């Protein structure tokens, strides 16, 4: 199956539900992660950010909550990257990196890829975003993770 076909199947599946298992024993934190990603896929970045903030409040050691904050602060088809969003995203992903030792290998991969997007300064962001896009696309192509495939497709837009 080609990447576009895989992405289409993932989009259709995600249209009704999103489950993004993360390393937490807190059901409300997991629910907030799932809701945040669902809202992100619906281009509701503000709502997604609030959901990821909620996940972090339930489980402050959850790297993926801070990864989600960085994701939600990033650009989408309707919202360009700004310096203010960049600063929040960079702070969040740096915190996720610090917490990622307790995360699964899959989660560490998502965190490491997002860290590429915010590795430099806002002035360097276009190059860093290209590095993120390339890494996310490679991960999506090598994994069977629907969320990686959706995020890769979104990064290509």
Where are these regions (language model features)?
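Short coil/linker segments at helix-helix boundaries
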Residues: 13-144, 151-157
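Hydrophobic helical h-region of N-terminal Sec-dependent signal peptides
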Residues: 8-12
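Bacterial N-terminal signal peptides that target proteins for export
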Residues: 1-7
């Amino acid at each position: 199956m080609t990447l576009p076909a895989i992405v289409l199947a993932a989009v259709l599946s995600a249209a009704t539900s999103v489950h993004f298992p993360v390393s937490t024993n807190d059901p409300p934190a997991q629910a907030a992660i799932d809701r945040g990603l669902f809202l992100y896929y619906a281009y509701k970045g503000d709502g997604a950010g609030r959901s990821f903030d909620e996940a972090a409040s339930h489980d402050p050691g959850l790297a993926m909550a801070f990864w989600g904050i960085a994701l939600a602060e990033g650009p989408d088809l309707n919202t360009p990257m700004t310096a203010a969003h960049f600063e929040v995203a960079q702070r969040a992903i740096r915190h996720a990196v610090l917490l990622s030792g307790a995360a699964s290998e899959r989660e560490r991969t998502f965190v490491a890829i997002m860290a590429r997007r915010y590795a430099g300064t806002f002035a360097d962001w276009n190059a860093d975003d290209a590095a993120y896009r390339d890494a996310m696309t490679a991960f999506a192509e090598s994994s069977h993770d629907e969320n990686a495939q959706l995020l890769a497709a979104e990064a290509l837009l």
